[in-house]
Amino acid sequence: MCRKTKSAIHRRDRCFVEGWRTVVKTKSHYDSPLGGITLIADETALLGLWFDWQPGYADDDSAVLGDSPTIGAAKRWLDEYFAGCIPRTEVPLRLEGTPFRKEAWALLRKVPYGETVSYGGLARRLELKRADGRRVSARAIGGAVHRNPIALIVPCHRVVGADGSLTGYAGGIETKIRLLQLEGVLKQTERTDVDCESIDRIWRSTR
């Protein structure tokens, strides 16, 4: 058991203390068609999801390797997504960042599957949402998108340049192309029809 020392990390037991509450974080891996994905969650929410080769995403050594209900839900979401289905599984998220980044990520989550938005378009949506009318630059939105800690579920791959160009994806442009092909935004040479209902039935039968 971790000693309840405020803000301390007790690495042997792979847990940490937030205030006076002991929090256990779990880390797991997922093999996607595009490569390995790392997931990190605490007892109540998903904290991180990224492709293993993304720069700036170091493993959290306070997390124990394993699975949890939250990570299980995230893996089910990924199964549905990579099968070419619009995911129906709800995954609780906790996005840590500045107030501005949280605003941008909240709007980003509303960009539908199979659609894209420009950095400038996302900036205008945020301006309209704000009561004070403060201007938001496309560059600031780009910074928030680049620092998104939960890829795919918070769909930063759906943000494109003003001219529709595929720019600025932390997972790499080739990955962005593959994701947008999967969603039908970009044409691909071959697509296999998938029975999304069967994916759901398989998950239910293994619970």
Question: Model-derived features: where do they sit?
Answer:
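Ala/Thr-enriched low-complexity intrinsically disordered regions
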Residues: 5-8, 22
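Intrinsic-disorder-associated, low-complexity terminal segments enriched in Asp/Asn/His/Tyr and depleted
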Residues: 10-13
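Detector for intrinsically disordered, low-structure N-terminal pre-sequences
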Residues: 16, 22-23, 63, 193
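DNA-contacting interfaces and partner/effector-binding or oligomerization modules
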Residues: 19-41
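Nucleic acid-binding interface residues in structured DNA/RNA-binding domains
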Residues: 26-33, 85-207
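Structural motif
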Residues: 36, 45-46, 158
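Compact structured core domains
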Residues: 41-90
